[in-house]
Amino acid sequence: MFTFAAFSALLISLAGVVAQTTGTSVDSSILTKTADSTGPSGFSIPALSELTSGAPTDSTVALYSTFAAGATPTVSGAPVLPTSALTIADYPALDVTPPTNSSLVKDWMAKIDLSKVPSYNVTTGDCSTDAAAISDGRCWWTCGGCTRETDIVECPDKNVWGLSYDDGPSPFTPLLIDYLQEKNIKTTFFVVGSRVLSRPEMLQTEYMSGHQISIHTWSHPALTTLTNEEIVAELGWTMKVIKDTLGVTPNTFRPPYGDIDDRVRAIAAQMGLTPVIWTSYTDGSTTVNFDTNDWHISGGTATGASSYETFEKILTEYAPKLDTGFITLEHDIYQQSVDLAVGYILPQVLANGTYQLKSIINCLGKDTSEAYIETSSNQTTTQITAATGSQSTFFQPIVGTATGAEVSAPSEATGSTAAGSAASTTSGSGASASTGAASNTSSSGSGRSATMGGALIALAAVAVGMVYVA
């Protein structure tokens, strides 16, 4: 488990790394920029220079609409909204990994064939102290940006932007929802289970408005630091609270901080979930994550102005070099990030006219109904071959989001302890790996962009990102 003490040590050790990937120094012309949008209902968006960690709290806005129990969704084949309200006592405590000894988690675990899950150790979440996890071929995104062919990391068509927001619903989400509704923009919301339990009506409005809902775990941990049982609990409870709220279950998830490896992938596959990360672009020795850094503003390591400048570089320097579309990382958990989106980023994209804004499921060329297990036309049973021997393989589910088939994964490190044990740790030395069907350097013949996240940027994401505000 990634403790606060461990996070503090990691943050201190990575102070130099963070300084390289985020900052508050920007072109002076950006500091004078004012909002291109007043927001829905004349809501006043602060000047860009005022979007800082010390910004005064905005007044919140109401949802443009709420929906009654039994209302019919726009998603083809979906059931009506559930008629029973959520009972908080029926769910785990907020913002902590759920207990693994509950009957539900035991039932979910019973459906997981652990012989088909690579027995890699849990990681420390820290690349500087976990060399063994880097070198054992597990395809750990956090340390090197490794992805598998079945990870969703881009939109196939050039100039299509897969828009997404993480960590909500929050008190500031209604402003974003209202703006998206006003402009007829669809996005993907990667929601935290604890936030859904706190604000189910916001999730229903997102869903009923045609946005894609996806999973972002129950308490926002770095998944590779968890045991198998804890991963199942984090994903399973989030799947359950979403279905209890909407009547459908997402078939995609985004690992917090992008922290994923083949063990997490294999467990998620057996739960019917396909991972979605964000696009990276590699040009020579430079690797850029399509991360606006809006989540750094609240912590003071970025400002609205510096995040906007990052966004402009993505849009003007890196996206045009791709043969494909792209997926970005943005957030609706913070006031500043929502103000940045509604007042600056989205209005500029609309005014520019170059990029088509779509939810991720739509940017893949699929109907929104393909985003949910119950309504997807692709009900292929997940097939996973045994994760043992020199050529272990796993199959990533393709329910609604088919991008590939069986993917070869290298065998686990010799003598490793099964990650199902809470006491599992790793140690040793080694260099970053590039094996199997992993992608961490360049595009394939299909024109796919490079998917190396970049160890420095990813490390900073794990470090600073642990300051998670509920």
From Swiss-Prot:
Q: Which residues hold Co(2+)? A: D167, H216, H220
Q: What are the Low complexity biased-composition ranges?
A: 408-447
Q: Where does acetate bind?
A: D166, Y257
Provide the cofactor list for this protein: Co(2+)
Which Pfam families does the record match to this protein? Polysacc_deac_1 (PF01522)
Describe how expression is induced or repressed. Induced during host infection. Induced by the antifungal agent caspofungin.
Effect of changing D166N: reported as: Abolishes CDA1 activity and results in avirulence in a mouse intranasal infection model, CDA1 localization is unaffected
**Under the cellular component aspect of Gene Ontology, which terms does the record hold?**
extracellular region; fungal-type cell wall; plasma membrane; side of membrane
Q: What is this protein called?
A: Chitin deacetylase 1
Gene label? CDA1
